[in-house]
Amino acid sequence: MRNNVVKKVLAATLACMMTFSMTTVAQAKGDKNSDKEITIGVTSFADTLEPTEQYFSWVVSRYAIGECLTKFDEHGEIVPCLAEEWDNSEDGKTWTFKIREGVKFSNGDDMTPEMVKASIERTAEKSDRVPEFFDLDSLEVDGQNLIFHLNRANANMAGCLADPLFLIVD
């Protein structure tokens, strides 16, 4: 009987030791004076940051590496992000997004409506998923506004542009 108690205590002790040995503490090391690099620890990540190549763009936006014109808040409502506001025509074929001023890309370049237009056009050229969201005829810049001209009405255009496929890249 004493032999069984010793075995149980030994087994429990080994189980605890194995459990605690599997936990580790990790700490990023780097030059505290460096302002050019950030280290992020993640459990998984896409093998590319290109939003049109794989459907891992949600990861990119989740880690705050890229942003869209609109986004969903914690209640699932569409709210402004890189666009300050938006409006649409009565027929639902023309959508105007006012592009936020004072935004910089990670390389320090200012984000302009022309750059946003080029980013959306790039996405439309590279991804065959764009028609699943909207039927784009053309894009036009008017001051701080980016105007989407659609071939068919789309009542959810602001929601479509919250999808990370439409991350604004420079």
Predicted segments with their positions:
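Bacterial N-terminal signal peptides
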Residues: 13-21
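Bacterial N-terminal signal peptides that target proteins for export
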Residues: 2-10
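Sec-dependent signal peptide cleavage junction
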Residues: 20-34
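Solvent-exposed loop/turn segments at secondary-structure junctions
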Residues: 45-48, 76, 102-104, 153-156
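Extracytoplasmic
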Residues: 33-37, 64, 81-83, 90-94, ...
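Aromatic- and charge-enriched surface segment that lines or borders ligand/interaction sites
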Residues: 84-126, 147
